[in-house]
Amino acid sequence: MKRNLLFILLLCVSLHHPKAQTGNNNYVKTTVPTVATTATSGLSVSNSITSYQYFDDLGRPWQTVQVGMNPSQLDLVTYQEYDAAGRSSAFWLPVNAASGNNGNPLSLSTVQSRSQLSSNYGDGKAYSKPVYEASPLDRVLEQYGPGQEWHNNGKRVKTEYLSNTADGELSCRWYRTTDTRGNVQVSIQSGKVYYPAGELYVTRTTDEEGTGISLEFKDKQGHLLLTRRKNGVIYHDTYYVYDSYGNLRAVLPPLAVDALAAAGTWTVATDGTGVLAQYAYLYKYDDRNRCIWKKLPGADWIRYEYDRGDRMIASQDGEQAAKSPALCTFYLYDIDNRPVIQGTCEFRGSIASLGSTAMLTSLKRSYDGKIIASGLENSGYNPNMTLYFPVVHTINYYDDYGFRSLTGFDNESYFPKESHLAGGLLTGTVTTLLDGSGKKLYTAYYYDEKGRPEKTVSSNHLGGYDITTTVYTFTGKPKTVTHVHTAMGKTQQTQVYTLSLIHI
């Protein structure tokens, strides 16, 4: 038995202090060429990015070495310590290794001495470190930031795990919510103003100075019920109220909480102080738990409708409802559930009737694939329901460039033919300016053979075009980005951005 214990202790010591030779450590080497190549043997730091990730005998990552990564082409080393229980302990900020390191791991003492150099941090405690509670839960009680000023002076973020009480700092009001004739009702029952003691989980966090205190209260289902911020002796509370299905029904910020402190029942209509209307966030749901009404502070209700496919098909805010005739915003989709048209139309009766079917559109094409100018504003899209006096705001096209036959895209000097397939990608948009002019802006998106954005051509409100062209490196990073801007009667402006690593 003693031999077994001795063996285990020796094993723990060996795992806690990994050896400093690459050949004696488990590692994964990753090399990413930055130029086209058929082999990695001849690559250097000038044309590749190489890193080593080292693992201890338990398979835990304890060090990462990025070869030649800093501007002086020195290795950049990140070190992770573990405590005796195998938990993450000190996590060191990256340090520069000495010249000629060649991807080898550093010992802890070397990392510490390198951190003290002025070329790194000039600090022997350049690491963050958690302090765990003495329990199998391994919860973090304290968190130190990098730097000896934090560690030597006990400056850390402190976390306490508590339960609520019936009064005092750890108390939580018991708000309830119901729907009454379409109104969201918030109430506190007489005799049940606060949650009973021990019903809620409370997490108290104190900042490094010991003055910034915040508390979070959660129920047994994990719902956040209260966030409490303490400013001196004053508490600022924000309450979150849920229904029996777990849907968020109300958010009460501090000014609303201060006014709704005693037992009572409130709705937007009956709240004589106007607190709910002015400060609260309120939500209503249908029998499928979809948000159908939303109220933001100081604003009127916003209404949402969905089709049988759970897609939002219409919305109406307070300003639209107040117009004569009333308006609503509609949303149309294609057969692949992609948004294709958004706009406004007259609101007649109930927009709920729109949800009785799936809001789809069909796209009319000629035999050669070109889109036929028909449907909503000659976009080619034909919805499967009646929209009264629709005004289209945005139109989206996907998969191909059949829309180039439509008005606005027929200038081949700026809108060239496609050069690669674009299946599943956004290829064109039409946007209507909302300044009352009715003018439209046209945009086409072009992609390379790998599906990366290669060229974007957009008409602008100045009677010209904006063209953005991107050239990629071998690794898929932007190498050059060229932006050309033209306007009617103005000189063409060209901007070229060149992006590169410092020494690659």
Protein language model regions, located:
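Bacterial Sec-dependent N-terminal signal peptides
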Residues: M1-G23
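Beta-strand elements of repeat-based all-beta scaffolds
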Residues: L5, A20-L501
